[in-house]
A protein has these predicted regions:
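Long, solvent-exposed, polar/charged low-complexity segments
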Residues: 1-57, 64-65, 182-258
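Aromatic- and glycine-enriched beta-alpha-beta binding-site module
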Residues: 74-165
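Long amphipathic N-terminal alpha/beta scaffold segment
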Residues: 56-84
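Sequence-level detector for tyrosine residue identity
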Residues: 7-9, 62, 88, 97, ...
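A generic structural signal for short, solvent-exposed coil/turn residues
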Residues: 78, 119, 172, 203-205
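Broad hydrophobic/π-residue packing in well-ordered secondary structure
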Residues: 13-20, 24, 124-126, 130-135, ...
Length: 258
């Protein structure tokens, strides 16, 4: 039996992404519940691995919103939901450090006590589904990103060693159906890829783009069966985490073990 059933994917069929009525929200809540079940399967392995990879500090935000969000002043900050995700990223301490040392990111003075250190403005590993596909996704940056992309690209520009390290970290992903994606354009990670070709593609990234490394699964894929999905996604975490650790910019001097 699949963890994510056809009705989970159907929760994002048009015109539902533009709707927020009780029936549509109830469908998204079922998606949220399934993603939290996936978290229960994955989190013990993440904890045992000792990775610097964390939940959002508020359980409410372990999974993306299942309903539209409107600020007190009437500004809509979530008014379209065509997919949902479970995500892991930087620690609360690291995000608090950013606030104390360099200031927060205040997007339209959002009335959210977590927005000053906006977990979702930073590099994350997430498990995502829409009406067509399930993704394991190392998300370097969204259309709004705080430091990670710019600092990562600076390192690639300035340091031959950084280029070599990225290429080294990519090797375990080759021929496993992963691709690097920038603004919807894909670069397949497969045998024959050279460091020059990889870096040339990665450096095309720009502010305002979604970018990262993805592996996709068809909704009826056997590896998404309840008996296999945990093993498969833990394997993906093991492959993606060293690259996440390399890409994610941190404001302290801790060494980054890979």
């Amino acid at each position: 039996m699949q963890l994510f059933q056809p009705y989970h994917y159907a929760a994002f069929d048009p015109p539902k992404p533009t709707q927020d009525d009780p029936v549509t929200v109830s469908e998204r809540i079922r998606v949220r519940d399934a993603l939290l079940r996936l978290d229960e399967m994955l989190w013990p392995a993440i904890s045992r691995a000792g990775w610097d990879l964390h939940h959002h500090r508020q359980r409410t935000h372990y999974v993306s919103s299942d309903h539209f969000i409107t600020l007190d002043d009437g500004t809509q900050v979530v008014n379209f939901i065509d997919g949902m995700w479970l995500h892991y990223g930087k620690s609360p301490n690291q995000l608090d450090y950013i606030k104390l040392q360099v200031g927060g990111y205040d997007y339209k003075r959002r009335d959210d006590d977590e927005y000053y250190n906006a977990f979702y403005l930073h590099t994350r590993i997430q498990f995502y589904l829409n009406n067509q596909v399930f993704r394991a996704w190392l998300l370097l940056a969204t259309d709004k990103n705080y430091y990670d992309r710019s600092e990562f690209l600076k390192r690639l520009d300035k340091s031959p060693a950084a280029k070599e390290e990225l290429f080294r970290l990519i090797q375990p992903l080759l021929d496993r159906d992963f691709f690097y994606e920038i603004d919807g354009e894909r670069f397949n990670l497969q045998s024959g890829v050279t460091q020059e070709l990889l870096v040339r593609f990665v450096r095309r990234d720009r502010p305002g783009f979604y970018s990262g490394i993805v592996k996709e699964y068809a909704p009826n894929g056997p590896l998404l069966d309840e008996s296999r999905i945990a093993e498969e996604m833990i394997k993906n975490l093991g492959l993606l985490y060293p690259i996440y650790n390399f890409m994610a910019y941190r404001f302290d001097a801790r060494p980054r073990a890979t």
